[in-house]
Amino acid sequence: MEKEGLAKSSDTSIKKEGFISQSLSKDGIPNQSLPDDHIGIENISVEPNKLYEAVSNLRNYGFNYLQCQGGYDEGPGKNLVSFYHFITVDDFQKIEKIKEVRLKVFLKRDSDLSIPSLYKIFKGSDWQERETYDMYGINFIDHPNPTRLLMPEDWRGWPLRKDYIQPDFYELQDAY
């Protein structure tokens, strides 16, 4: 069941809300449950303007480690997606007891591609957000160093987008 105002995923499966999605809803954060992944991890979509609030709540629920942040392109004319994989980490926790959740933010390609940086909550998001910016052009508001990480600063375009057109030339540089 899709909630009003949330960007649509290309996956049209209807999913019953999971526990974390229900908790976010109870805390007043609009979200949409997406189908669980192949190993049963709950996937949730949130609006860009609610990302920071949703992640703050996840941190309060015990999800204290950002395991991975990245992006992907659903295809030409479709959404760009920023995803976040959170886990619980505890000194005395058994590996089979680790809780996991994945948040996704769907951004329309022809709209504003800006979302809040999570650097203030998770310092480890620094280079991950920079790489996502570098490869997909998703801007992270309030990031402390919003520069390219892998490509030269003067590079044009976003190489991992599916509509990216590779330049016909490469400028060779002297080794001296």
From Swiss-Prot:
Assembly and oligomerization: NDH-1 can be composed of about 15 different subunits; different subcomplexes with different compositions have been identified which probably have different functions.
Keywords on record: Membrane, NAD, NADP, Plastoquinone, Quinone, Thylakoid, Translocase, Transport
Organism encoding this protein: Prochlorococcus marinus (strain MIT 9215)
Gene3D superfamilies reported for this sequence: NADH:ubiquinone oxidoreductase, 30kDa subunit (3.30.460.80)
Chain intervals with Polar residues compositional bias: 20-32
Compartments where located: Cellular thylakoid membrane
One GO CC term, this protein: plasma membrane-derived thylakoid membrane
Chief place where the protein resides: membrane
Protein name: NAD(P)H-quinone oxidoreductase subunit J
Cross-referenced InterPro entries: NADH_DH_suC (IPR010218), NADH_quin_OxRdtase_su_C/D-like (IPR037232), NADH_UbQ_OxRdtase_30kDa_su (IPR001268)
EC number: 7.1.1.-
Catalytic activity, reaction form: a plastoquinone + NADH + (n+1) H(+)(in) = a plastoquinol + NAD(+) + n H(+)(out); a plastoquinone + NADPH + (n+1) H(+)(in) = a plastoquinol + NADP(+) + n H(+)(out)
Chain's role: NDH-1 shuttles electrons from an unknown electron donor, via FMN and iron-sulfur (Fe-S) centers, to quinones in the respiratory and/or the photosynthetic chain. The immediate electron acceptor for the enzyme in this species is believed to be plastoquinone. Couples the redox reaction to proton translocation, and thus conserves the redox energy in a proton gradient. Cyanobacterial NDH-1 also plays a role in inorganic carbon-concentration.
Molecular function as annotated in GO: NADH dehydrogenase (ubiquinone) activity; quinone binding
A biological process term (GO) from this entry: photosynthesis, light reaction
Broad class of enzyme this protein falls into: translocase
Membrane topology category: Peripheral membrane protein
Pfam families per the UniProt record, alphabetical: Complex1_30kDa (PF00329)
Family: Belongs to the complex I 30 kDa subunit family.
SUPFAM superfamilies per the UniProt record, alphabetical: Nqo5-like (SSF143243)
Annotated stretches, region: Disordered: 1-32
